[in-house]
Design a protein with these regions (language model features):
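Residue position in alpha-helical solenoids
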Residues: 2-6, 47-54, 95-103, 122, ...
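Residue register of alpha-helical TPR repeats
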Residues: 12, 16-19, 60-67, 107, ...
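Alpha-helical rod/repeat scaffolding segments in eukaryotic adaptors/tethers
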Residues: 10, 30, 58, 78, ...
Length: 141
């Protein structure tokens, strides 16, 4: 792919590419094309990991990594893969919790609360899905 062969001295091109992939993933998610959204989010996360390895103190990159785990976790949740969603949400929570303690911008208590909420809501989602499945089983012998 030509995109990866272009010189990118300060990582700005890769940052913009990851941002674009994230926006595309969001659009695909809104169109209910979850597999395509997942592919975009995963590619954006990989680029962010590479950039973060080169700049481990970059708060914006840390935020992007946090957001990537949240987005991929949300896709897993929408696909009823609750165990996978839980693992991804726990990873995002750990990134957020660590960076709130360190005072890394843009992490704050609101982001932490949101992350905790997503993780805490999963058992309710799982229960509702199980109840729907059981109701369908009773209707269709």
């Amino acid at each position: 792919m030509i995109i990866h062969k272009t010189a990118d001295v300060n990582g700005m091109f890769k940052r913009e590419y990851a941002f674009t992939l994230t926006k595309l993933g969001t659009a695909k998610e809104q169109m209910e094309k979850l597999d395509e959204a997942l592919q975009c989010y995963t590619m954006a996360m990989q680029i962010t990991k590479e950039l973060l390895a080169a700049s481990p103190d970059d708060g914006k990159l840390k935020w992007n990594m946090f957001a990537s785990y949240e987005q991929i976790g949300h896709i897993a949740e929408l696909k009823h893969n609750y165990r996978e969603a839980e693992l991804l949400y726990r990873q995002s929570l750990e990134i957020c919790r660590t960076n709130v303690k360190l005072g890394t911008r843009p992490f704050d208590e609101d982001a932490l609360a949101s992350s905790l909420y997503r993780l805490g809501a999963l058992p309710l989602q799982r229960k509702a899905t199980d109840e729907r499945k059981n109701a369908l089983k009773k209707r269709c012998p």
